[in-house]
Regions:
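Acidic-and-aromatic substrate-binding clefts and catalytic sites of carbohydrate-active enzymes
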Residues: 13-21, 43-51, 76-82, 105-110, ...
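Structural recognition of the beta-strand scaffold that forms the well-ordered cores
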Residues: 9-13, 34-39, 73-76, 96-100, ...
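Active-site beta->alpha N-cap acidic-glycine motif
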Residues: 1-48, 52-66
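Alpha-helical scaffolding segments of alpha/beta enzyme cores, especially the outer helices
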Residues: 23-30, 55, 59-62, 85-92, ...
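His/Asp/Glu-enriched short active-site or ligand-binding loop at hydrolase and phosphoryl-transfer sites
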Residues: 71, 81, 86-122, 157-168
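C-terminal domain-boundary segment and adjacent tail
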Residues: 3-9, 18-20, 137-201
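Short low-complexity, flexible loop/linker segments enriched in glycine and/or proline
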Residues: 25-28, 51-53, 113-115, 173-179
């Protein structure tokens, strides 16, 4: 559908979904869209230990690479739950953690028209829209998406991938050409969170 509309987007796949439907994952890349990881099993990473966090991220990216040939370090953490400790535990595995500022509300199952209105009424330049493809939401999202695209284009917006969106921000480094390929410097010093201190001042 996106290809027919002449637009591209960024898809965040869970590793288990890429394993279950490798042809679909490959078709996303072949259509010129960007791909990122939603970890492996779409379970929340917040509060998990270092080993679990790294395993979820690594298995997710490996499954995506196996299905698509694309190596990505771009993460949309499940439920947008990713805390400071998660960052410290995975800084060498993740280039950027992406959230959204417009939730289409597709998961509420209020209908395609309501979903479309939520997006169009909330839109301002640079916004990131969350659309999901779960079994419960997929049919409604597929119905709403052409209307959303047509509405945004009619309002003068251009729909782009996250990496292309970042390139429009002149405050960011010119070297940041793709969010999916940034890595930590080899000599990076990993921060340590302070130990809990019960003393008061």
């Amino acid at each position: 559908m996106l290809k027919e509309k002449g637009v591209t987007a960024t898809f965040f796949l869970s590793g288990d979904a890429a394993e279950a439907s490798p042809a679909t994952a490959k078709a996303i890349v072949d259509a010129g869209c960007e791909i990122g990881s939603n970890s492996y099993s779409d379970d929340s990473l917040k509060g998990e230990d270092r080993e679990t966090v790294r395993k979820q991220i690594t298995k997710g990216t490996e499954a995506i690479k196996s299905a698509t040939g694309v190596e990505t370090m771009l993460l949309r953490a499940p439920y947008a739950a990713f805390d400071e400790q998660n960052w410290i535990d995975s800084m060498d595995l993740v280039s950027a953690v992406v959230s959204w500022n417009i939730d289409s509300g597709d998961w509420l199952l209020n209908g395609a028209d309501e979903q479309m209105s939520t997006v169009l009424d909330s839109m301002t330049p640079g916004n990131i829209v969350l659309l999901t493809d779960s079994d419960e939401c997929a049919e409604q999202t597929l119905e709403a998406l052409p209307q959303i695209i047509d509405g945004l284009v009619a309002d003068g917006y251009k729909i782009v991938t996250l990496s292309d969106l970042v390139k429009t921000d002149t405050a960011l480094s010119k070297k940041l050409t793709s969010l999916t390929k940034v890595s930590m410097p080899k000599n990076a010093v990993f921060p340590q969170l302070p130990e809990d201190d019960d003393t008061t001042e």
